[in-house]
């Protein structure tokens, strides 16, 4: 039998008979289904599809360079947004987040974008449209979710963590403004070595949405609109975020009552 020399194809072959006991509290099992080349407007990638036993959804990874066995891999978790990604909605910044994330990764030696089928922060497309209708009547994005009986964010990252494990990624530099993603991945055993900020300038339709994410959901967003894609290695202070006396101490992210509290971050200091 010919053994593939390509690292991704070796993983795919290995996963044809993959049958693990599950990963994390939910016993999530993920395996690679297929690998192909995918040229895009943002650059050339390889696309990897996955099976999983958690939600029966077909999540994919967009991969740049050789990430198998690598550490400090620039990684973006992008949740599906039909209205933004495909239809160009201006109510959110999802399409810009997706495209700019791919462009950023395409400039690097290696990187990953996980495209997760978690429409509407996990509440699904129909409920997202219902939430939009409530926002049309004056509620913000958090209030709309709560009014429908959901939490602010219903997403779960167990599958994403196992996707990274299946790709044999040793540690990630997470491209995110969301401290909950850092906390979730860390909780599932993923080593997050640092954060790369990913702020998109707002438009007149999504400015309030982005302000709400910063003020109410704890996202690290400077919603003044300045483009910002640099890696955060120095202490930062963002309007609406915890004050200077809330700076990380002893390797913990924020105070115990702040989103992301207690996340071990070996090389990151945030306010």
PLM ranges: what are they?
Residues 1-271:
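Catalytic domains of riboflavin
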